[in-house]
């Protein structure tokens, strides 16, 4: 019974970290978010100032162990931080969620030499961010399911390393990262689950260039971009784990990726809920505030239920991912995001309805949150694919 307490009782460290994050959001994110979101050039939505300020207060590196200059936050605390960031802006939450998550993976998956080469440099650089290259134009959410196709981005063995050709797209932090974990097909004729290798990739490697920055409907304070490889040589010492066994790294080292995505979108749901409550107190209809109308009151309570339930699911998944001996269940690595994103989308539409016509006007700020709320219906796996994956885990023949 003692084991489950951390999910329900916030400790002093967590409280202090979240206060720091909330102050950072209020000072650095909230004042800038609308303006950055409105810039028509998608690359300009990204703010180096925000990243540098996050570095100053220790957010950027918090999942690094103290040995590497971080706080060594566990997955539960990290999820709380990711949600708190998203209350200020979804894109800001996503750029740090990716970086914090990949820093966790690197400390498990990289060998000692690779860690010594990468982690101190990442920790020192106030703009240092991380990215993971999986998604391709032809291979999207189907990588969550055992699928017979290979990755199209492929590598040929050569003396001392590999020659990589191909392209990744929709990559979060793709144009901003200094280090990448890149998943590439190294064995022809095998499905991606059997013939892919994970490489450590540096930003300045010859033959690797950034393609376009995607012009997204929402989540615009995060950049997503194409990674292009033209005869890019990656040396053998950059192979992560074993050649051909790259796919295992995803499942083995990072079961809580899904819950982190869920935490980002739950932060957006929280921001929408707060906006709906504030408006319902302010807006007079039929001679009294909206919040005194039973239908609206009940709906605000239902929003609260959906947010609390999503958060509990996320916290349980994160805690058990770090303590799998206490009953980790693989569906916890798939379903929290599906639940949280459905809840957030429902809350977004309700918030817009409660605002009436004002919810459709840009200057009230609801429209931005609605665009952001749509992002995770597909991000980190299309929900339908995730339900199928969960079913395959539940009913494995």
Name these PLM-found stretches.
Residues 1-88, 112, 157-162, 228, ...:
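Alpha-helical interface subdomain recognition
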Residues 204-235:
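Flexible, small-/acidic-enriched active-site or ligand-binding loops
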Residues 165-209:
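A short core secondary-structure module
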Residues 230-248:
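Long, acidic (Asp/Glu-rich), low-complexity accessory segments flanking structured domains
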Residues 125-138:
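A short, Trp-centered hydrophobic/proline-enriched beta-strand micro-motif
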Residues 73-74, 144-147, 173-178, 192-195, ...:
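Short glycine/proline-enriched turns and hinge-like loops at secondary-structure junctions
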Residues 29, 93-115, 140:
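N-terminal glycine-rich flavin-associated loop
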Residues 139-141, 147, 162:
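Hydrophobic, small-residue-rich alpha-helical packing segments that form membrane-like cores
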């Amino acid at each position: 019974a003692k084991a489950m307490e951390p999910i329900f009782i916030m400790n002093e460290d967590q409280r202090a970290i979240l206060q720091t994050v909330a102050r950072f959001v209020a000072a650095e994110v909230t004042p800038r978010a609308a303006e950055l979101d409105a810039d028509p050039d998608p690359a300009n939505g990204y703010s180096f100032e925000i990243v540098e300020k996050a570095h100053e207060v220790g957010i950027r590196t918090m999942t690094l162990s103290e040995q590497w200059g971080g706080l060594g936050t566990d997955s539960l605390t990290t999820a709380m931080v990711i949600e708190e960031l998203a209350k200020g802006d979804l894109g800001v939450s996503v750029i740090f969620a990716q970086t914090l998550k990949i820093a966790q993976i690197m400390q498990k998956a990289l060998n000692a030499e690779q860690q010594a080469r990468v982690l101190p440099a990442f920790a020192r650089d106030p703009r240092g961010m991380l990215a993971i290259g999986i998604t391709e134009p032809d291979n999207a959410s189907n990588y969550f399911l055992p699928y017979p196709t290979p990755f199209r981005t492929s590598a040929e063995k050569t003396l001392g390393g590999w020659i990589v050709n191909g392209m990744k797209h929709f990559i979060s932090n793709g144009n901003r990262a200094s280090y990448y974990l890149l998943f590439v097909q190294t064995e022809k004729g095998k499905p991606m689950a059997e013939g892919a290798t994970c490489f450590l990739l540096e930003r300045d490697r010859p033959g690797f260039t950034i393609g376009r920055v995607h012009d997204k409907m929402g989540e615009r304070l995060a950049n997503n971009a194409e990674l292009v490889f033209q005869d890019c040589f990656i040396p053998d010492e950059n192979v992560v784990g074993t050649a051909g066994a790259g796919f295992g790294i995803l499942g083995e080292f990072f079961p809580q990726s899904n819950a982190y995505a869920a935490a980002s979108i739950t932060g957006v749901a929280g921001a929408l809920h707060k906006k709906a409550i504030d408006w319902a107190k302010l807006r007079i209809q039929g001679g009294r505030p909206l919040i005194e109308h039973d239908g609206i009151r009940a709906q605000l309570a239902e929003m609260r239920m959906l947010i609390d339930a999503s958060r509990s699911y996320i916290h349980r998944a994160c805690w058990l991912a770090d303590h799998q001996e206490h009953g980790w269940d693989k569906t916890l690595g798939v379903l929290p995001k599906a639940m949280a994103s459905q809840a957030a989308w429902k809350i977004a539409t309700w918030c817009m309805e409660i605002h009436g016509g004002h919810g459709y006007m840009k200057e009230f700020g609801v429209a931005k949150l609605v665009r952001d709320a749509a992002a995770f219906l597909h991000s980190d796996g299309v929900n339908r694919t995730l339900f199928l994956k969960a079913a395959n885990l539940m009913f494995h023949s």
